[in-house]
């Protein structure tokens, strides 16, 4: 039996999570497998996988998730599902950094709820690990009480977070008597799960299954043939939707939910071993996404959204009523009126959303405006602002730690509010701030904001085209923190985005930083396309989504390597910090 070393790593919010490290049997390993346990369990219950997988040349790692095993936190809870997904990213990066193993030489094995966390991470963060093995992912937990999910959601809205206990007995997880006995007697088993996490698990799983094509890593999916805990239909749908060029599905007849702890698990472990060894013997990168604006599923989606709906179709009539109400009663709302005038994707609208102060004609107008500002997309935008401020602070800390100056430049700043308000997070003020935008209106409003905040000696605002490679490359002073936020999401053409990024690659010195944003998913894409207008001559605001894998590849092509990422709770907006190579 391989012996584990016990360690901890720090999460983004400073929590120390427990993990086990099983070193390779002989010498220092250049390859690793990272294991993620089922819901309610902990890393100690994965020892048998480490031993029975029979891969002695691989270092192996497994954590105790927040609120599980020997990690801190309320049992079965986390601040949010997205926080736990971020924990996955931090753990994998910790393994790579602390143990000297390249991300490309790490494989990931995950079960049940752990497999949903890992699938969401693969979708939202586009990690460049070698492969994923997902066993019985809990994409759709069976709740046998009618309307249980809706009832839990209502109670959660009324009373806040609370806990429910798992109804699943060990005998429905596995046929293995020893695994049943150990489950029933293990004091570290967590029976409870918070309703916050349970509801978020459903939401994340539905999103990832619906948009599985964004996942392009090699994936092996193990499905238990007699699973009473989760609905396997969602697992089959996920597999069919995967964008991976290498994917393998194994259905194991008679297996209960604990696929890797079943009595006949040698079948599953053997297939896993073969898949993992094949993936590590190959090193074929996935097909490039640089031409995704010409072909691919997000291009097809964009084309569908740009097509007119049949005039009398129910969907078109609903959208027509929405447009009519916005252009009539909606004008009582200051935010809607501003969007109709300048475009709902304009810098002026963005600044209004950041300020988040409902305004309108009459109390009804204020009420409409509050509802408008509280729409999911705008809530996500405000979280993105906070993440931008965190990314700027993180870049500044790295620069200060190495004795380098902090010089900030944002090439499409809108009104520049998020950059100027990020100064409150910085321990030391930067040497300079340069804000640029193509719009005279934004330059004027941003300059006024600089004056309002009395930052004239530190910051200046100039007109500039973020897609002009030469203009961007000649930015002075040369930035050590370059920012491009909310711009590339509005333009589908990768050639234009690459020109902008190449300019930034020339402007930013090796070792300095770029902060860029993405929008890999949005639940309201069709509503936006059918009802809102853009800043471009009042055309319909039709967006082509870029998956996180696509925007990361564009950044790498321009010479940047992602170091860290922030994602909101809904998986809509991302902020990435990258270093110039």
Where are these regions (language model features)?
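Catalytic nucleophile-loop/oxyanion-hole region of alpha/beta-hydrolase
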Residues: 40-43, 69-104, 268
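Catalytic active-site module of serine/aspartate enzymes centered on a nucleophile-bearing elbow/loop
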Residues: 250-303
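Class I (Rossmann-like) S-adenosyl-L-methionine-dependent methyltransferase catalytic domain
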Residues: 375, 390-394, 417, 421, ...
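A short glycine-rich, Lys/Arg-flanked "PGG" loop and its adjoining helix->strand segment in the class I
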Residues: 498-510
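Short alpha-helix in the alpha/beta-hydrolase fold that links the catalytic acid
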Residues: 217, 231-240, 497
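Short beta-strand/loop motif that positions the catalytic acidic residue
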Residues: 215, 221-223, 227
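Conserved alpha/beta-hydrolase
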Residues: 50-73
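Class I SAM-dependent methyltransferase Rossmann-like catalytic core
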Residues: 333-401
């Amino acid at each position: 039996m391989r012996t584990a070393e016990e360690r901890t790593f720090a999460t983004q919010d400073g929590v120390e999570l427990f993990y086990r490290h099983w070193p390779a049997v002989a010498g220092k390993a250049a390859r690793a497998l990272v294991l993620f346990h089922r819901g309610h369990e902990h890393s100690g219950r994965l020892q048998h996988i480490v031993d029975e997988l029979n891969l002695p040349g691989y270092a192996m790692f497994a954590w105790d998730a927040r609120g599980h095993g020997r990690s801190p936190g309320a049992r079965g809870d986390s601040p949010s599902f997205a926080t736990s997904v971020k924990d996955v990213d931090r753990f994998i990066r910790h393994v790579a950094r602390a143990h000297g193993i390249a991300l490309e030489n790490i494989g990931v094995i995950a079960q049940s709820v752990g497999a949903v966390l890992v699938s969401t991470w693969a979708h939202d963060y586009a990690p460049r690990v070698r492969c994923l093995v997902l066993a019985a992912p809990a994409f759709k937990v069976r709740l046998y009480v009618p309307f249980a999910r809706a009832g839990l959601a209502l109670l959660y809205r009324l009373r806040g977070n609370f806990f429910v206990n798992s109804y699943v007995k060990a005998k429905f997880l596995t046929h293995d008597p020893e695994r049943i006995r150990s489950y029933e007697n293990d004091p570290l088993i967590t029976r409870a799960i918070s309703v916050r996490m349970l509801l978020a698990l459903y939401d994340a799983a539905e999103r990832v299954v619906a948009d599985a094509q964004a996942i392009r890593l090699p994936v092996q999916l193990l499905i238990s043939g007699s699973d009473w805990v989760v609905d396997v239909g969602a697992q089959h749908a996920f597999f069919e939707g995967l964008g991976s060029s290498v994917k393998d599905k194994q259905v194991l007849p008679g297996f209960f939910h604990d696929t890797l702890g079943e009595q006949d698990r040698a079948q599953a472990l053997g297939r896993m071993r073969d898949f993992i060894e094949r993936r590590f013997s190959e090193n074929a990168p996935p097909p490039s996404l640089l031409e995704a604006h010409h072909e691919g599923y997000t291009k097809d989606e964009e084309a569908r959204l740009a097509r007119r709906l049949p005039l009398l179709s129910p969907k078109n009539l609903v959208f027509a009523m929405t447009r009519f109400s916005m252009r009539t009663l909606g004008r009582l709302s200051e935010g809607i009126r501003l969007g109709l005038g300048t475009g709902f994707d304009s810098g002026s609208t963005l600044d209004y959303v950041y300020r988040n102060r409902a305004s309108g004609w009459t109390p009804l107008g204020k009420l409409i405006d509050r509802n408008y500002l509280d729409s999911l997309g705008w809530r996500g935008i405000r979280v993105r602002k906070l993440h931008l401020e965190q990314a700027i602070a993180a870049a500044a800390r790295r620069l200060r730690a190495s004795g380098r100056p902090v010089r900030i430049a944002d090439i499409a700043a809108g009104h520049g509010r998020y950059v100027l308000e990020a100064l409150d997070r910085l321990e030391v003020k930067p040497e300079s701030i340069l804000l640029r935008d193509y719009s005279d209106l934004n330059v004027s409003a941003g300059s006024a904001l600089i004056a309002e905040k009395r930052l004239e000696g530190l910051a200046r605002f100039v007109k500039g085209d973020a897609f002009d490679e030469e203009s961007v490359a000649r930015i002075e002073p040369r930035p050590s923190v370059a920012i491009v936020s909310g711009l590339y999401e509005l333009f589908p053409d990768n050639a234009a985005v690459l020109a902008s990024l190449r300019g930034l690659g020339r402007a930013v010195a090796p070792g300095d930083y770029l902060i860029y944003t993405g929008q890999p998913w949005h639940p309201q894409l069709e509503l936006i396309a059918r009802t809102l207008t853009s800043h471009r001559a009042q055309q319909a605001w039709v967006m082509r989504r870029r998956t996180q894998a696509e925007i990361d590849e564009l950044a790498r092509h321009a010479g940047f390597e992602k170091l860290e990422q922030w994602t909101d709770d809904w998986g809509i907006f991302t902020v990435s910090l990258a270093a110039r190579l």
